[in-house]
Design a protein with these regions (language model features):
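…; additionally, a secondary subgroup of soluble metalloenzymes is captured
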Residues: 1-193
Length: 193
């Protein structure tokens, strides 16, 4: 064993934005036969009871800083969803997107592909905690458009402050179009490495 083998090398499973969630990148490669950033938003939409649509989906997460200065998701209550929809939908429509709501989870969808990728929200605490800004946790040629959209959402939520909980910002992640998932097999899981 081991004779004639190549020296070990570093294998990168995902782009740097997803370094804190390589398990998602690996699972994405196994289940879809595609590389790149793992796309999770359309599957979250479908898992929450939404129909399969031929559009890109993005999960929109409202956030605030906790007492320790870390980012945490703001859980909206069902009674707050109409106010959230009234505040956010006009901005989404102006950007060529549609605000979709499933339960208390916000999604954006659009027909035109978006050259933008962002770290998953649950990884932001590490990303921002390391001294980086939120802007360092996103990439792509459409990044300025996404940043402007997030700023507009934040301003709208703060304007509707009496009807919504304290929201310091929004985050888009998991974006992309639905891709059929292939049944996993041990062979494909190993071959994916």
């Amino acid at each position: 064993l081991g004779t004639g083998r190549e020296p070990p090398g570093l294998q990168r499973l995902a782009e740097p934005l997803h370094d804190r969630s390589p398990h998602q990148a690996w699972l994405w490669k196994v289940l879809t036969h595609r590389s790149g950033a793992p796309i999770t938003a359309p599957y979250e939409w479908i898992a929450s009871g939404g129909p399969v649509l031929d559009q890109e989906f993005w999960k929109l997460t409202p956030w605030q800083r906790n007492s320790m200065g870390q980012l945490e998701a703001v859980e909206l209550h069902e009674s707050e969803m109409p106010a959230a929809a009234c505040a956010l939908d006009p901005i989404a429509a102006h950007a060529g997107m549609r605000l979709m709501i499933s339960g208390t989870t916000l999604f954006l969808c659009r027909r035109k592909p978006w050259a933008f990728s962002a770290a998953p929200f649950r990884d932001l605490a590490d990303c921002v905690g390391a001294g980086a800004s939120l802007a360092a946790c996103m990439t792509g040629s459409d990044k300025p458009e996404a940043e402007n959209l997030l700023e507009a959402f934040t301003a709208a939520a703060q304007t509707a402050a009496g009807k919504l909980p304290s929201i310091e910002g929004f985050w888009l992640s998991g974006g992309g179009a639905y891709t059929p998932i292939f049944p996993p097999s041990t062979y494909r899981a190993v071959a994916c490495d």
